[in-house]
Design a protein with these regions (language model features):
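Hydrophobic transmembrane-helix bundles of small-molecule transporters
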Residues: 2-107, 114
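12-transmembrane solute porter fold
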Residues: 63, 88-243
């Protein structure tokens, strides 16, 4: 039933986009850089697989991890050199060197890695643990953690956007990041004696500070910081960093 509900909502979204939105494209629409896509896909695939294998720790095949990382590095090197030569690169090398690219992508990657691990892994698992946790059932835990987190972000997102228009993206982003750190510190103390109310508080707190503020600002900056001649590269790479 959950999957059918998701399918119905997706179908409604498809119809809504078709009916209520207008198509938009960049001023220039060059051909797809397939020569750059291939080495980039190989590089990212190998690096992600290497990290997944390394996550097994004692049971990990470290030889495989090293090989995958080497292949990934070779893929990135090939991608870099391809982008310097093709007429319409997927990502111009000049943009790859700029601070607006790496500052945004590294912030997105690092914050998402931490918050995702806490909110999608540690908090729900702690809530369900009957020995060290709150002993909440699997059918209830999402209502205490993930749902409030998502709803808090949904409600506060428009507020964060309004704040950014008045105070600036940088200030609001920094506020969200500081708040996220505070929320994670609070989580450390919650671990000692978790219950439904403390987990709910942490979930809502992080929902506001990260999902509602920091996440929204990072998405917005992906658009604001994009150069006029290549408006799609930074939002696309930022989406990859989120994933």
């Amino acid at each position: 039933s959950v999957f059918w509900t998701m399918a119905v909502l997706c179908a409604i979204a498809v119809v809504a986009v078709q009916v209520f939105t207008k198509e938009s494209t960049a001023t220039e629409t060059p051909r797809m850089d397939w020569a750059g896509v291939l080495p980039l896909a190989v590089a990212l695939g190998c690096v992600l697989t290497a990290f997944n294998e390394a996550g097994k720790l004692a049971e990990a095949n470290w030889f495989l991890v090293i090989i995958l990382l080497l292949i990934g590095a070779a893929g990135f090197w090939a991608f870099w050199n391809v982008e310097k030569k093709v007429a319409d690169p997927l990502v111009p090398v000049a943009y790859l060197k700029q601070r607006r690219t790496w500052a945004l992508l590294s912030t997105t990657l690092l914050t998402m890695t931490g918050v995702f691990a806490v909110m999608n892994g540690l908090i729900p698992n702690l809530g369900q643990d009957t020995d060290a946790g709150a002993g909440i059932s699997a059918s209830t835990i999402s209502w205490v953690t993930l749902t409030p987190y998502a709803l808090a972000g949904l409600v506060f997102g428009p507020i964060a956007g309004w704040m950014a228009s008045k105070m600036g993206y940088k200030y609001v982003l920094q506020t969200g990041l500081i708040g996220t750190v505070v929320g994670l510190i609070i989580s450390i103390f919650v671990v000692g004696a978790p219950n439904a109310w403390t987990l709910l508080f942490v979930s809502i707190f992080l929902g506001v500070t990260y999902a509602g503020i920091a996440n929204i600002m990072l998405n917005g900056l992906g658009i604001v910081l994009s150069p006029a001649d290549n408006q799609g590269y930074l939002p696309g790479m930022n989406a990859g960093a989120f994933n």
